[in-house]
């Protein structure tokens, strides 16, 4: 994980080497289960990303949130010599009250004392679910993503940076996240580290100057809408145990038609480096297997040519 952030930083300069730096690391909060009414959740504690930031910047101070061993999680992995500048909170982020201010539930806890709105210069979001078949629900991964995104939007300082792991930029779901980050930030860049992610659909978006973009005035309302959606994903559905994210749920950001009309070219610019890395990696894998790739094969295997969820227009521009 340390090598991944090193690659990202080398391309985007997202981790300053000097000056005061307060950061939030949810990158190792890997919950296999987000149903807050069940127990036995495992997680991997903050380590690699935090270690890189603390070593790079001697004035950096961090906050990491994850389950500890007493709750079924893993041991705290950060080097002991760095822990004086780091606060670790043993908790499940899905147990926090991430809905609107007036929403109440006996299942939820207030945000920890170490977390304050607008407190962090840098927010690192790399959480992915580790599934347990008998307990996890299909939408738990979507709830996990939304939970960490809400924490980042609330926690980042005006002018701060968000580094977030996403998947397949051509998907409507992902494209809308890229759109809002692009609109509320001064600069948005994408990066696909060769470490681990080269042949996977995952990549990272780095939003610099969050709160200084052309749509920055919308941020409070956007956070409120995400919080309302979080309640729906957590307690909605026919049985009141949550539901899947639907395409229309992000319409409050931008409609699909407007996204295509106004963001297609920008989306392709942001996605090109991601697609190039993955395509080159897949080419090497195919060459190593001594098989000749066909166009139809790339349609099935490469995210470069499987963007059928945004629009035919974006697909056409991407292939052309």
Give short role names for the model-derived ranges.
Residues 4-16, 196-320:
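C-terminal lobe and adjacent flexible extensions of AdoMet/dcAdoMet transferase-like proteins
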Residues 71-119, 130:
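S-adenosyl-L-methionine
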Residues 1-37, 55:
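Class I SAM-dependent methyltransferase Rossmann-like catalytic core
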Residues 25-31, 40-47, 67:
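Class I SAM-dependent methyltransferase "Motif I" SAM/SAH-binding loop
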Residues 67, 71-73, 136-141, 177, ...:
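Class I S-adenosyl-L-methionine-dependent methyltransferase catalytic core
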Residues 60-68, 90:
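Conserved SAM-binding motif I beta-strand of class I
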Residues 42-43, 114-134:
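Conserved proline-anchored active-site loop of SAM-dependent methyltransferases
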Residues 135-189:
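Conserved Class I SAM-dependent methyltransferase catalytic core
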